[in-house]
Amino acid sequence: SDYLQLARG
């Protein structure tokens, strides 16, 4: 779970 990747989505 990456919160940074979540911001990218």
UniProtKB/Swiss-Prot annotation:
This is Extended FMRFamide-2. The keyword Secreted applies. Disulfide bonds: none annotated. It comes from Lobatophasma redelinghuysense. Its main location: secreted. One of its GO terms (cellular component) is extracellular region. Belongs to the FARP (FMRF amide related peptide) family. It is found in: Secreted. FMRFamides and FMRFamide-like peptides are neuropeptides. Keywords: Neuropeptide, Secreted. GO terms for biological process: neuropeptide signaling pathway.
